[in-house]
Each structure stands twice: as C-alpha cells, then as structure tokens.
C-alpha cells in the first residue's frame, strides 16, 4: 500500500522535527535550524518552489534512514547528498529537486577549487567533510560540473547552505512548507 502525498509530507515533517535533536556538526545551531534557514533564504530570494524544497531538504540524507551508513569521522553521513536525493526520489519528488540536492556537495568542491578565498571561509567542520567528499575538484571535474544544466542553481543551494548557520534567526517552521511539498508531489505524479 502506497502512502498518500499528505502522509509522505507528514513523514518528512516528522523527520525535520526530529532533526531538532541533531547537532549541525561544528556549528552553533541544530540540523533543523540549518535546514529551515536555508529554505528561508531561498524563498526570500524569490527562488522557485523546487529550489526552496531542495534548500530545505538538502541535508536529509544525514537523518532520513534508521540504518547505518558510512560515517565521515563523526561529521555526518558519507554521501548524504545521494542518500537524501534517492530517498526523495522514492517519495516522488522531481528529478530536479534530487539533482540539486546531489549537487550541493559538488558545488562546495567546485567553489573550493575555483575560488582561493572560499576554502578560508569554510567552517572547520565543512573543511573536514570536504576531505571525505573528494576534496577540491580537478580541472576535468570543474568543466563537467560547469556543463550541468543546473550548475548555477547548485551554486545557489550551496550559498544558502553556507549562509544558513546563524544563531537566533527567526524563520518559519517545517509546517510552513507542507502545502508546497504536497503540491510538488501532486504535480510530479505520473
């Protein structure tokens, strides 16, 4: 028996709420606050709903499964971008949302390799996870990444990811995104 779109969204909201208890490793906020801030910045910038949802759910792979995935030395789930994207594909989210989520780690690797100042501005935790994520891209990887149709959108997700680490920022809670998620799932049904 498959879940209704409303039930799928309730599961996601429950996962988001539970992430309140998870440290956003190396930062002064929790995982929920980070996710909500990223979505807030996306929405405030005028991004479309798929971008807002990708920003909201980009770190879902750290906490969407009860099973144990390979760890990045205490810095979260290795390949969390793929774990989260695949989880959302299974729920019926669009390929664009999944690809944007997969692309946020590649965007970090790209920016580190193409902007000397970017690495200096990363938090200690983000620098540490970069090692597990493949380090800076080489020239060939950069060219391939730049050829992606969603290249610029992946960089935007990454920018919101970096910005979404503020303490005491008041933003809407997970329920604010319920209707957006339900409509997205309805639009993407075959």
Curated annotation (Swiss-Prot):
UniProt binding sites for (1R)-(2-amino-1-hydroxyethyl)phosphonate: 27, 62, 108, 126-133, 158
Cofactor binding note of this UniProt entry: Binds 2 iron ions per subunit. During catalysis, PhnZ uses a mixed-valent Fe(2+)/Fe(3+) cofactor.
Pfam families from the UniProt entry: HD (PF01966)
Amino acids binding Fe cation 2: 59, 80, 104
Gene3D superfamilies listed in its UniProt record: Hypothetical protein af1432
Cofactor section: Fe cation
Effect caused by changing residue 34 to A: Loss of dioxygenase activity
Protein name stated in the entry: 2-amino-1-hydroxyethylphosphonate dioxygenase (glycine-forming)
Organism expressing this protein natively: Uncultured bacterium HF130_AEPn_1
Gene name of this polypeptide: phnZ
